[in-house]
């Protein structure tokens, strides 16, 4: 029976692809996802639990035989159970993972690397979210390994509160990134004060 587990199994960065090896993952019908859209930064009406973060996100995918986004989505469906970071910032991590995987990957040896650097404004519903000044340095490897395939996700997310002008984060329901957020069970609600604001509930 297939199951998810965290194991120590390093990807070999030094391996060089053989001639003729594709420089991008194999095509799947749900592989290439367009980046989500952002609404322009507007005056936030509700001032409680608003945090401005400078985000750095990177996901390295190691899969010697290529990988399917269906496997990644299956892995992310168990994200709540394997997440090892700060629980007050799990919502931010889920948002960043969705955004990172919406970008185009850069081949790196046997791996594909997705990166994101952005300043985003998050707003949490009452009693949720990080403490004032709280930051996140999250790094984890999550691995799918069965008799047929091996896929390793090396996730790194850095979130530091900053004062650089950013964009207000809001779910675009027409974006395929919503598939990933739905898979991870991202908990949000629309702000009653601002229709362009998605409040995080975790």
Swiss-Prot record:
Places the protein is found: Virion membrane; Host endomembrane system
Top-level lineage group: Viruses
InterPro entries cross-referenced by the UniProt entry: Rhabdo_M, Rhabdovirus_M_sf
GO molecular function, one term: structural constituent of virion
A Pfam short name: Rhabdo_M2
Signal peptide per UniProt: none
Chain positions of motif PPXY motif: 35-38
Function: Plays a major role in assembly and budding of virion. Completely covers the ribonucleoprotein coil and keep it in condensed bullet-shaped form. Inhibits viral transcription and stimulates replication. Plays a major role in early induction of TRAIL-mediated apoptosis in infected neurons.
Subunit structure and binding partners: Homomultimer. Interacts with nucleoprotein and with the cytoplasmic domain of glycoprotein.
Further remarks about this protein from its record: Most abundant protein in the virion.
Similarity field: Belongs to the lyssavirus matrix protein family.
Description of its domains: Late-budding domains (L domains) are short sequence motifs essential for viral particle budding. They recruit proteins of the host ESCRT machinery (Endosomal Sorting Complex Required for Transport) or ESCRT-associated proteins. Matrix protein contains one L domain: a PPXY motif which potentially interacts with the WW domain 3 of NEDD4 E3 ubiquitin ligase (Potential).
Protein name: Matrix protein
Taxonomic lineage: Viruses, Riboviria, Orthornavirae, Negarnaviricota, Haploviricotina
């Amino acid at each position: 029976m297939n199951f998810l587990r965290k194991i120590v199994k390093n990807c070999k960065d030094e391996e060089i692809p053989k001639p003729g090896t594709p420089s991008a993952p194999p095509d799947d019908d749900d592989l290439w996802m367009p980046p989500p859209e952002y609404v322009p930064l507007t005056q936030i009406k509700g001032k409680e639990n608003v945090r401005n973060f400078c985000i750095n996100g990177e996901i390295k995918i190691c899969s010697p035989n290529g990988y399917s986004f269906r496997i990644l989505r299956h892995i992310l469906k168990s994200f709540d159970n394997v997440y090892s970071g700060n629980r007050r910032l799990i919502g931010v991590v889920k948002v960043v993972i969705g955004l990172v995987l919406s970008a185009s990957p850069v081949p790196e040896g046997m791996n594909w690397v997705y990166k994101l650097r952005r300043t985003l404004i998050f707003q949490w519903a009452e009693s949720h979210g990080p403490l004032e000044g709280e930051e996140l340095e999250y790094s984890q490897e999550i691995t799918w390994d069965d008799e047929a395939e091996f896929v390793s996700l090396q996730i790194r997310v850095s979130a530091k509160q900053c004062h650089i002008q950013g964009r207000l984060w809001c779910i675009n329901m027409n974006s395929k990134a919503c598939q990933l957020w739905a898979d991870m069970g991202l908990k949000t609600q629309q702000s009653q004060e601002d229709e362009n604001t998605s409040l995080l509930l975790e």
